[in-house]
Design a protein with these regions (language model features):
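Membrane-embedded catalytic cores of phosphoryl/pyrophosphoryl-handling enzymes
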Residues: 64, 72-76, 188-289
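Membrane-interface loops
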Residues: 105, 142, 154-222
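N-terminal transmembrane-helix/juxtamembrane module of multi-pass inner/ER membrane proteins
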Residues: 57-137, 177-179, 183-189
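Hydrophobic alpha-helical transmembrane segments
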Residues: 133-150, 216
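Aromatic-anchored segments of alpha-helical transmembrane domains
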Residues: 91-93, 168-172, 235-244
Length: 289
């Protein structure tokens, strides 16, 4: 993998600037939380992994309109049925939470005893990492990803990203005001307002990093890097959810509900993308061969 300038020079400049004509600038400011810097660096790595396989600038010069990029002979099949299953699971979980089920009460108490402690190192980590799931941060991260996909002329993938994120977060707002569950009464370690179920941080992170998992499967050729990135993307929402419980602003059932909702919209969104874009393009490629 060849970079256009040394990492030392890029660090000195204070931002990463890839090929200037085609690529967006990802700025890393000293005031940014460590978690955000890690995310941007990983996103940059994803770009270079894709660029290494395709020579994107040259390819995009020779492409009119949308460029169909896919780096796997067997993309994930239609996810409609798993999506419907997750819809049912989410509906049952939301019903249990809204009814004040004893099962949910026991579940929350059990997980809280395991997760919460007052270790200063854990508190510092949780306060920093939880910022990665803030609404403003998730919005910025989504916009960055959306712009990168537009620059690549991946219009279908870009609108898949935007559609999933808008629907997931919009539906989250509706459910919050339908269930109206109050947050834990224990002292919060970070500021949080609004209703508790489902966790907006968990919804947003599960949706965004679920999208990144899909894009990594579709676009990254190397099995090693594909596997590594998928593991890393999966860890982000898990850790964000953990921090929301740790800083006392959500019950574990809020976090689990958020994960389920986010994954549901990724599965349903990919089903739409597969039927109306990937499958037709794959068939078109086979006919040309």
């Amino acid at each position: 993998m060849t970079l256009n300038c040394s990492l030392t020079r890029m660090a000195t400049l204070g931002f990463f600037n890839t090929r200037r004509v085609h690529n967006p600038i990802l700025r890393l400011h000293s005031s940014q939380p460590l978690s955000e810097k890690i995310f941007l660096l990983l996103l940059l790595d994803l770009y270079f992994l894709i660029d290494n396989d395709y020579n994107l600038p040259q390819m995009l010069k020779n492409t009119r309109g949308s460029a169909f990029l896919i780096n796997t002979k067997r993309p994930p099949k239609d996810t409609l049925i798993p999506g419907i299953i997750f819809v049912v699971i989410y509906a049952v979980w939301a019903a249990l939470v809204s009814s004040g089920s004893q099962f949910i009460h026991n579940f929350d108490n059990t997980v809280i005893k395991i997760v919460c402690n007052t270790n200063p190192a854990n508190v510092a980590f949780a306060k920093d990492f939880t910022n990665l799931g803030n609404t403003s941060t998730i919005t910025i991260e989504t916009i960055i990803l959306f712009i990168i996909l537009l620059v690549f002329k991946q219009y279908a993938y870009a609108w898949f990203t935007a559609g999933v994120m808008i629907c997931a977060n919009g539906y989250n707002w509706i459910i919050k005001h339908a269930v109206m569950r109050h947050r834990p009464t224990i002292k919060h370690l970070v500021y949080a307002d609004g209703y508790s179920f489902p966790s907006g941080h968990s919804v947003g992170s599960a949706a965004l990093f679920g999208i990144l998992i899909i894009l990594t499967i579709l676009l990254v050729k190397s099995k090693f890097w594909k596997t590594l990135l998928i593991i890393i993307w999966a860890l982000f929402p898990i850790l964000i959810g953990y921090t929301r419980i740790f800083v006392h602003v959500h019950y574990p059932s809020d976090v689990l509900g958020g994960w389920i909702e986010g994954i549901t919209f990724v599965l349903l969104g990919y089903s739409f993308l597969y039927h109306f874009y990937i499958e037709p393009k794959m068939l078109e490629m086979k006919r040309k061969q």
